[in-house]
Structure formats: C-alpha cells, structure tokens
Amino acid sequence: MTELTTIAFDIETTGFETDDKLTVVGFDSAVSSRVFLNTGGSTPTTGLADRVNDTLQTPVQLTLHDSEPELLTELATFVTSTLTQRDAKLVAYNGERWNGGFDLPFLRTRFCTHGLEWPFGTLPYVDVMDVFEKRFNTSEDSLSGVYGELIGSGLNDLDPFADSGEAVTVWEAGAYEPLITHNVADIRRTRALMELAERYCSKSDFSMKSLEPVI
C-alpha cells in the first residue's frame, strides 16, 4: 500500500441526476493539487488562480475549461500522461464502494455521455471510507466529520462551506474561489485520512480494486 503514492481525488457537480454536469475535478498529492474548473463559458475574475494559491499553503495548479467535454478531455490527458505513469493509487472518500459511492459512477456517466474513453484503467483504486467504517471507532461518517474526530479542525477550517450543497449555488453564481477552495479542502482531507489509515491499519484492511474496463 504505502509503496504506491496516494493521489486523492474529488468532484463537484451541479447535482445528482443523470443530466447533471461536472463543475470541478481535483487531485491532490504531497507536492501539489491539480484542479480542473468548468466555467460553463463564463469568464472568471482576473487573478483567480493567484487568489486561490494565496489562501492555500501547498500549490494548486488550476486550469479553466469552457465546457464539460473540454474539461473531461483535458482530464483524460492529465490522467493518462501523468497519473498512470507513476506508481500511484487513486483514493477517494465514498467515491465508489461495493454498495454505491458517488464520484466514479458520476464520472463514468459523463465520459459515456460525451463518447469519451475511460482514462483510469491502469490505476488501482481505494475507497478510504470503508476503512474508517470498519477499523476506527468514530461517531461520524462524513469526510469532514471523520477528519474532525481523528485529526482535528485543520482543513475543516479551510472549507468555506458548511454544506456541500453550497457548491451548486456558488458555481451557478460564478463564485469560483470558494468552490475551488472547498474542493481542495476535500481532496486534502481525503489524502490526510488515507495516510492516517496507513499508519494504523494493515494492508489486508484495505480493499484495492482495478478500474480497468473489461473491453
């Protein structure tokens, strides 16, 4: 487990339905974060990336995309040219589990909708939520709740949203800075929890799966 670098990821969307869209996709490693923003064709205020980086200690590389297909195309290029070339594992919190999850099913639907190939095939995947449900005695099950109980306030204080539903409202209003900050808080909380779990749990406690399609 630990010989594979953790790449945490999380997405933001306009909702949960089949025709809802991606607004943000973020990845985080120990070195930096990589964030893709769908602007829906709008023009963000000047200096957005600089303001985001002024708020956050570890660098964030931000790219802007006018549409969801453009975001997905650039995302696929990043995954295949960068992530799959590393000894890395993809990690999410409730991204995809045996009984559900959100991020990966949503991504599959959007790639399929636009007729794009699935880019994550060679990356192993771990859902860290499973470990904390089974191997830690916590009273919370949300990402922020488990992080707060086991690690402390830290990145929870960074998150500008009290409810993830705010991510939809601010995107529609073109208020991208808090949306990006929320996503970065999520991916960094996810990576922090994965590192915590690796310090206290055995390899057999983690369920690692392949994301490679059959065909």
Question: Which residue ranges define each predicted feature?
Answer:
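Conserved non-catalytic scaffold segment of RNase H-like nuclease domains
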Residues: T2-R108
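Short alpha-helical "patches" and their helix-cap loops
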Residues: N38-T43, F206-P213
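Metal-dependent phosphoesterase core characteristic of DEDDh/y 3'-5' exonuclease domains
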Residues: A30, D87-S207, L211
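Terminal disorder- and signal-encoded targeting elements
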Residues: M1-T5, M208-I215
